């Protein structure tokens, strides 16, 4: 595993601020806030991603709604304990923020324009789950453990499609892989034991390319390249 943790986990987002910043936590006198960023898709829809940011990155501690910004950082996870239950919370941890020069222009969207890209280098935590949708599309669910400084790890859910999904069936638990994709938000319904239904939002990486990291096996690298597929 690459011990340069910035290379293990890097994300670039360009979008529009859609919420007021909310206080999250404080560490050694440094306050952190959360806000929501809307990133447009080619389809015309948008992904709404939570961003965690230090007060030290905000000019005059201001972050107006509708501001258009770019964010460089990492896609991270942490556990939220509610009674006896545990939930995996995902957020983008901002390391750099830039206000777009022309705030009046719409955020451009195109295949050659990077507005949502994440690169992760991690380990397969459990056997990928391969399945087909009712429409016959191949999907594989992957849980990736990405090492971070101070002996921490981020557990990132990923979705592979098509040939990448089929290929994941053969990837063993513990394999080190590198994925490139985008972070997406997805609404779903959680049914509780008492029959009530709660609407939730899941955050995950939609994988556009995937490769096994094995410097000693050229055969693996060739096989993975054959399985690279655009979103």
Language-model features and meaning:
Residues 1-231:
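Single-stranded nucleic acid-binding surfaces, predominantly the OB-fold ssDNA-binding core
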């Amino acid at each position: 595993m690459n011990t340069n943790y910035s290379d293990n986990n890097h994300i670039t987002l360009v979008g529009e601020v859609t919420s007021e910043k909310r206080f999250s936590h404080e560490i050694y006198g440094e306050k952190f806030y959360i806000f929501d960023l809307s990133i447009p898709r080619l389809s015309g829809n948008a992904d709404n991603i939570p961003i965690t940011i230090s007060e030290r990155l905000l000019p005059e501690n201001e972050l107006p709604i509708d501001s258009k910004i770019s964010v460089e950082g990492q896609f991270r996870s942490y556990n939220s304990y509610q009674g006896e239950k545990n939930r995996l919370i995902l957020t983008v941890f901002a390391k750099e923020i830039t206000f777009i020069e022309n705030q009046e222009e719409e955020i451009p969207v195109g295949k050659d324009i990077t507005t949502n890209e994440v690169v992760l280098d991690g380990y397969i935590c459990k056997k990928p789950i391969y399945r087909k949708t009712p429409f016959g599309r191949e999907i594989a669910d992957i849980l990736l453990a990405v090492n971070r400084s101070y002996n921490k790890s981020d557990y990132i859910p990923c979705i592979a499609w098509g040939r990448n999904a089929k290929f994941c069936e053969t990837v063993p638990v513990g394999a080190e892989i590198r994925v490139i994709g985008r972070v997406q938000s997805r609404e779903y319904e959680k049914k509780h034991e008492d029959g009530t239904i709660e609407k939730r939002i899941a955050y995950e990486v939609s994988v556009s390319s995937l490769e096994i990291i094995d410097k000693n096996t050229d055969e693996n690298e060739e096989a993975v390249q054959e399985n690279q597929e655009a979103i």
